[in-house]
Amino acid sequence: MKFSVYRYNPEVDETPSMQDVEVEVPEGRDLMVLDLLELAKAQDPTLTFRRSCREGVCGSDGVNMNGMNGLACITPVSDVARRGKLVIRPLPGMPVIRDLVVDMGQFFKQYEKVKPYLINDEAPPAQERLQSPEERARLDGLYECILCACCSTACPSYWWNPDKFVGPAGLLQAYRFLADSRDTATDERLAALEDPFSVFRCRGIMNCVSVCPKKLNPTQAIGEIRTMLLQRGT
């Protein structure tokens, strides 16, 4: 099979380029995109990409495949190849360190802004802080984020303002703790989100929903935060 992969080594290359690669695919097998990259790397060890778990858990191998962000390890080639063509690029909107490896620093800075951890100023209980089944169920679809950055790097608002806009991944986690019955920092969290580059920078394009490998819905979470902010102001 032939495919094209983005190549760029800032130590030696003046500009990025696309490299055509041909690998031998076992007959009758639908490989994952990561398998193609591994086969290509066996031919050219200088090809650089991130990967770890191979099961869609670690979130380290996010790439852009024929214009769609996703995890290479759980994306079948047949899902993204079009007329036998496949182009693999790094996640868009982030500085490239080398080939398919991007600098995630800005992404994690935005994530850190929302304080993605439980805040509770009450005296610690003798045992764990309990939740009812209904309270626990409110967190489903919020806590499963694996920080792969596929959503934020598919978002035009994030492309335009990566140093200001929190992005869908961060805002999903902001709502995850706003929705947590054990968290006591609701006012503090909402006050921090009253910012023109927070939830109201989202344009509802829903690219984030389309590319999330965990089938989460950051757009819905952002809408919930907007509702809370509006109710807080009345």
Regions found by a protein language model. Name each.
Residues 30-45, 84-234:
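Ferredoxin-type iron-sulfur electron-transfer modules in oxidoreductases and energy-metabolism complexes
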Residues 24, 64-68:
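Short strand-turn-strand beta-turns centered on an Asx-Gly dipeptide
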Residues 18-31:
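Short, contiguous acidic and Ser/Thr-rich linear segments
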Residues 68-88:
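Glycine-rich phosphate/adenylate-binding loop and adjacent beta-alpha elements
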Residues 53-62:
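Short, structured protein-protein interaction patches enriched in aromatics and acidic/basic residues
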Residues 5-11:
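Short polar catalytic/cofactor-binding loops
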Residues 1-3:
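Short structural boundary motif marking the start of a folded domain
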Residues 62-63, 155:
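Short beta-strand scaffold segments in enzyme catalytic cores
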